[in-house]
């Protein structure tokens, strides 16, 4: 992921932004560097990749495409990272030229340091040669970023036929030797540029498996050896690297880039996931043995330490906050821009705010919740580490648990209360609705879960007359009828009784047919308790309605 420091740093000059427009967009921008008229304020490169035109100033931190992973935005991020490193080096060099030394300060190193800075300044384009193996080192923690750079210069020194007993180093040797080394390095880069283009394109979307063996075995380095004659140079494959690096012990703390780290970071922009910097300051670590043409080339820790202090001090003094810090961006900087959601308890979730709110909106639509529950969805999604599947699962579990609890409370409270009231003619809510809704009756609104109310006495509890059959036939129509005979809720006992009446109609019709067939036979008298407010009829309704459900 491109770090926030890299993209938000104001380290790009006008010419760099123009180059970025020309290279990323694939054509000339609206304002060219050669035009006489003053150039317009730059627009956001990421928004321009998606067809928008928004002024860059004040917009960078709020751009909706900050974490976009499309091809254009990845190229833009790599180019901006390289430009930031170049600008940091230029500022450090300008400060070294203008700043007067104070007490307890030492001047920069001999002209070899200037040569090294200028090499890092203009080697950005041809430095793709070693991007493939530097990329592999970045993918495993970012601590091996200087390995490819050091190995390349060692190969250049070997090709220059340096004496085996006195090899030339970056800063320890004379300025003439350093200049010849860098000159050969440039020639080597130019010679290999065409061959490296295809390799860079192949490695642009994939991170290669790289076996880093004996990681912490070469802390005690041996004097390095170089062959007297070497006719062919080749970039070592991934399996040839066995480098190890000790823990970073640079005194800069903030991770000011060393010269070799900056070069490795600069050269790694050829891959789409190329990192923006090496590990922390590498003053305590030495590169392990790398193999070139079957010959062991091992760098000592003391040899590599000489390249660190001066560039680190100059960068630390000039670009403490504006320049990107390789130690803070190593490892993660080489990954493609992605929405990482693996943070604990939602802390620092690098999701865009619009994406996060869009997830909350999807949860609302899935569970059909009102808009007022948006803050609740936000809290649930944040607690679930911005994982919408996990948040949905938690909400579903909570809903099932609440439904189970409501059903348990109803059975423990309302059903015994209905039985104690002594009204067997009323059907309890679960008995009625379970046949219609199955086991999901608790999804109905809670307003329907309430104890039954008493029925008015005038509807069905008229005293029975001794006339027998006429009393029975006259009592039945006295109960209110319903057009469809459905039950609306347990809160309306009238509808419940209506369903009981309609369900018992076939029984009454059978009785009437039997009476019409034998008119001389009197009907059997009702039981003795039938005169007590019509309880016989209510009991009959209860049995028939239960059977009907």
From Swiss-Prot:
Pfam families reported in the protein's UniProt record: DM, DSX_dimer
Biased composition (Gly residues): 271-292
GO CC field: nucleus
Residue ranges of the TM segments: none
Primary location: nucleus
Amino acid composition bias (Basic residues), ranges on this chain: 129-152, 205-223
Effect of residue 59 to Y: Abolishes DNA-binding
Name of the protein in question: Protein doublesex
